[in-house]
Structure formats: structure tokens, C-alpha cells
UniProtKB/Swiss-Prot annotation:
One of its GO terms (molecular function) is oxidoreductase activity, acting on diphenols and related substances as donors, oxygen as acceptor. Fe cation binds at H215, H272. Its EC number is 1.10.3.9. It comes from Synechococcus sp. (strain RCC307). A quinone binds at H215, S264, F265. The record marks A344, A345 as: Cleavage. Photosystem II (PSII) is a light-driven water:plastoquinone oxidoreductase that uses light energy to abstract electrons from H(2)O, generating O(2) and a proton gradient subsequently used for ATP formation. It consists of a core antenna complex that captures photons, and an electron transfer chain that converts photonic excitation into a charge separation. The D1/D2 (PsbA/PsbD) reaction center heterodimer binds P680, the primary electron donor of PSII as well as several subsequent electron acceptors. Coiled coil: none annotated. Tyr-161 forms a radical intermediate that is referred to as redox-active TyrZ, YZ or Y-Z. C-terminally processed by CtpA; processing is essential to allow assembly of the oxygen-evolving complex and thus photosynthetic growth. It is found in: Cellular thylakoid membrane. Its main location: membrane. The lineage of its organism: Bacteria, Bacillati, Cyanobacteriota, Cyanophyceae, Synechococcales. This is Photosystem II protein D1 1. The D1/D2 heterodimer binds P680, chlorophylls that are the primary electron donor of PSII, and subsequent electron acceptors. It shares a non-heme iron and each subunit binds pheophytin, quinone, additional chlorophylls, carotenoids and lipids. D1 provides most of the ligands for the Mn4-Ca-O5 cluster of the oxygen-evolving complex (OEC). There is also a Cl(-1) ion associated with D1 and D2, which is required for oxygen evolution. The PSII complex binds additional chlorophylls, carotenoids and specific lipids.
Length: 359
């Protein structure tokens, strides 16, 4: 019988903790960015779920007209949202301890700030964790670069846009219909559909979907035949097998004949770089567009650009968009004291011919 005696490690508890955090042998890599990511995302997720279910109405416009967003106050999954913090709070940081009571904090939309700030810190840390794991494994850092696109988009709608507009009440609500409401109001106030950076983002998202579907279907179809002509190719493979089944030469030949030769990649790395770069660059541009429109550098205005020989306006698609935007804007601003300036821009009639003497 043999007895094995293992010498106790002389490492301190802190050193053991550091080794565990940075170990790539863990089932899920933690990393130093993970130490920040885990608690912040847990806090954001917990607060979001509780607020979505049970938060009381929020005075989003700061005019004592609370808007209910939670399920217990009559909403469903589609209409429910975590309502942004009040316009009365503006850009002030509004943690729980800044409110006189918990009821006041809830009424002014404090949970929204708690969720978005923890969420943003969490996704920034997740991006850093992607780089950290790549570094530990000796990989190149492009995974976190690709992830920076949705991070930039989230930062644009939750942080940059409220900064530019002067209030967190202008941020995107955390819900399905709230997202659509944000998009409609954004079009009304900034004409985003006529902004080139938004157009690049649309090309990036839809083009990325198209290229992804084309690539996946082409790879799935380009099998190395392991069977005879008289039986199904599928008999030559087991799902999930380790051996290579895909022939890039065959795929290149097929696609080159389907479109034309130079539309097809014969280099796998070039192909996958293109598949990654196309949507990422498109979403970068959209985030940049939202960030510039946050400061009212809006989309192109081609309203009433075409006139006939008599000076009458010939409406174009730009004029149709403008009319739709005006309608969305007056529905959005329910309180009359904040009437949209572009609708109130008619010539003002004097109410007094002479200013009264003062004193």
C-alpha cells in the first residue's frame, strides 16, 4: 500500500484567489473584468426584472403625469417597460440615497438609472473580459473589437443621447413598445431616416444577415462526398463529427459561377473578416449617427425642395416623412406648454401696438 503526501501550498489566500480568477481551466472564465462584470450585471438584471413586474408609475415628463410601465399596473409583455427617470431630475445622478424616500425615488424613475448604469458598466466589463481571455489564450483581440459595435449602440441610446438632450427622460425606455416609441420620436425630432450614418447601419444589419445566411447555407451544402452516387451524401457523415466535411474550393467554384468569379472568396480568413467587419462597421456608424443627432446635428432636410413653374411645391418622399414626423411629434408632446417649435413657427401677431410704460 502506498501513501501519497502532498505538500500544502505556501500561497496566501489572496494569491490563490488571483490564480482562480485568471485561470483558463475554469468552466467559465472569470477574469479581473469578470469581477466587475458579474455583480453589475446581476444588479442590473435583478432591478430590471423587479421594476418591469412591480414598479409604480413614473413622472417621466416632470409635469405630474405619471406613466405606468410595469406588469402589475396593467401592462403586458409588449407594452411594459422600465420607464426612464423624470425630466425633473434631468441629468442629475439619482441613486436611492439622494431621494427623500423610496416612494419618491420610484416616482421619479430611479430604477431606470440603476439599471442602465450597472448595465453599461457590465457590458464594458464583458468587452474587457473578452479581450482578457483572448490575451490569456494567446489569441488576437478582434472578438472584443467586434463586440464594441453593440456596446457603442447601447452607449449611444442610454448615455450619449440623454447627455445631448439634457435629460435621462429622453433615453430609450427598457421595453418593447418603449423602444418603438423611442424610434418614432427620434425620427420626428431628428429625421434619422435621412441621415447617411443610419443608412449605413441598415446596410450593415441587413447585409450582415444576408451574408450570414449565404455563408452558412453554402458551407452546409459544400460536402466532401464520402458515399457513392447512388446513395445519399448524408450517410457519409455523423452530426458533430470532428473530421472536416467542408471543401472551400467547391464552395468557391459554386459561388463564382452563381454570381461571378470575383464575388467569391477563395481565402477563408478574408471571407470571415468580411463577415465580421460588414455589420460591425455599419453599427459603429449608426451609433456615431445617434451620438451626433443627440446634439441636434440632424438628418438631411430636403423638404419642399422641388417646385413647379408656378412656385407650387411638388411633394417628395422627404415631405411625406416630414408630415409623418410632425404628427409623431405632437402626439409625443402631450403638454401644451412644450409645443413643438416647428409647428409654432408661424408669424406672430402683435397683441399691443405700444409697450406699456413700466413704473
Amino acid at each position: 500500500m502506498q501513501t501519497t503526501i502532498q505538500q500544502r501550498s505556501g500561497a496566501s489566500a489572496w494569491q490563490q484567489f488571483c490564480e482562480w480568477v485568471t485561470s483558463t481551466d475554469n468552466r467559465l472564465y472569470v477574469g479581473w473584468f469578470g469581477v466587475l462584470m458579474i455583480p453589475t450585471l446581476l444588479a442590473a438584471t435583478t432591478c430590471f426584472i423587479v421594476a418591469f413586474i412591480a414598479a409604480p408609475p413614473v413622472d417621466i415628463d416632470g409635469i405630474r403625469e405619471p406613466v405606468a410601465g410595469s406588469l402589475l399596473y396593467g401592462n403586458n409583455i409588449i407594452s411594459g417597460a422600465v420607464v426612464p427617470s423624470s425630466n425633473a431630475i434631468g441629468l442629475h445622478f439619482y441613486p436611492i440615497w439622494e431621494a427623500a424616500s423610496l416612494d419618491e425615488w420610484l416616482y421619479n424613475g430611479g430604477p431606470f438609472q440603476l439599471v442602465i448604469f450597472h448595465f453599461l458598466i457590465g457590458i464594458y466589463a464583458y468587452m474587457g473580459r473578452e479581450w482578457e481571455l483572448s490575451y490569456r489564450l494567446g489569441m488576437r483581440p478582434w472578438i472584443c473589437i467586434a463586440y464594441s459595435a453593440p456596446v457603442a449602440a447601447a452607449s449611444a441610446v442610454f448615455l450619449v443621447y440623454p447627455f445631448g438632450q439634457g435629460s435621462f427622460s429622453d433615453a430609450m425606455p427598457l421595453g418593447i413598445s418603449g423602444t418603438f416609441n423611442y424610434m418614432l420620436v427620434f425620427q420626428a425630432e431628428h429625421n434619422i431616416l435621412m441621415h447617411p450614418f443610419h443608412m449605413l447601419g441598415v446596410a450593415g444589419v441587413f447585409g450582415g444577415s444576408l451574408f450570414s445566411a449565404m455563408h452558412g447555407s453554402l458551407v452546409t451544402s459544400s460536402l466532401v462526398r464520402e458515399t457513392t452516387e447512388s446513395e445519399s451524401q448524408n450517410y457519409g457523415y455523423k452530426f458533430g463529427q470532428e473530421e472536416e466535411t467542408y471543401n472551400i474550393v467547391a464552395a468557391h467554384g459554386y459561388f463564382g459561377r452563381l454570381i461571378f468569379q470575383y464575388a467569391s472568396f477563395n481565402n477563408s480568413r478574408s471571407l470571415h473578416f468580411f463577415l465580421a467587419a460588414w455589420p460591425v462597421v455599419g453599427i459603429w456608424f449608426t451609433a456615431l449617427g445617434v451620438s451626433t443627432m443627440a446634439f441636434n446635428l440632424n438628418g438631411f432636410n430636403f423638404n419642399q425642395s422641388i417646385l413647379d413653374s408656378q412656385g407650387r411645391v411638388l411633394n417628395t418622399w422627404a415631405d411625406i416623412l416630414n408630415r409623418a414626423g410632425l404628427g409623431m411629434e405632437v402626439m409625443h408632446e402631450r403638454n401644451a406648454h412644450n409645443f413643438p417649435l416647428d409647428l409654432a413657427a408661424a408669424e406672430s401677431a402683435p397683441v399691443a401696438l405700444q409697450a406699456p410704460a413700466i413704473g
